[in-house]
């Protein structure tokens, strides 16, 4: 059973589509038929907060379930871009080439930020309501680095390869997905 449990950190909950999003995420990974994939999924479901974690502390998708949403958004965007480019490309691909590329898109996009699971910590901080002049506790996200291992691209590659073998292209796509924003 790959249905993730729902955490309720700091009184927040994932949105109503949470379960269907998790099913799409898991189904896409299983569709690659990559050896070890079910073990990786089992790890994500049972040993991490991947499906309820935020994608960041304050920038993109910084809410419960944000990491799942962000990963699916990257996947859909990359898939759409790939198919648009294939239509314009004059060199047709055979079915095996298409399948290999599609599998790499699934793996690279959905797993690029896997290192953010078990990374963010939900807490609260006091914020003054400017209208009422009262202080109130609001949910706040910090982080707790339990596994320092290079930058987050390096760490994602390391975690993924504990379960599945990445192609060179997948490893580079994940490692360098921050592009110009990578710190090293």
Predicted regions and their residues:
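Non-catalytic interface/linker regions that flank or bridge core catalytic/transmembrane domains
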Residues: 1-53
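Generic alpha-helical segment signature
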Residues: 15-19, 67, 149
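Residue-level detector of well-ordered alpha-helical segments, enriched
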Residues: 21, 25, 36-40, 70, ...
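Structural motif
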Residues: 30-35, 66, 97-100
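All-alpha helical catalytic cores of prenyl diphosphate-utilizing isoprenoid enzymes
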Residues: 39-48, 60-72
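Surface-exposed loop/turn and secondary-structure junction residues enriched for glycine/proline
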Residues: 53-54, 70
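Divalent metal-dependent catalytic cores for phosphoryl transfer on phosphate-bearing substrates
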Residues: 56-57, 61-63, 76, 81-83, ...
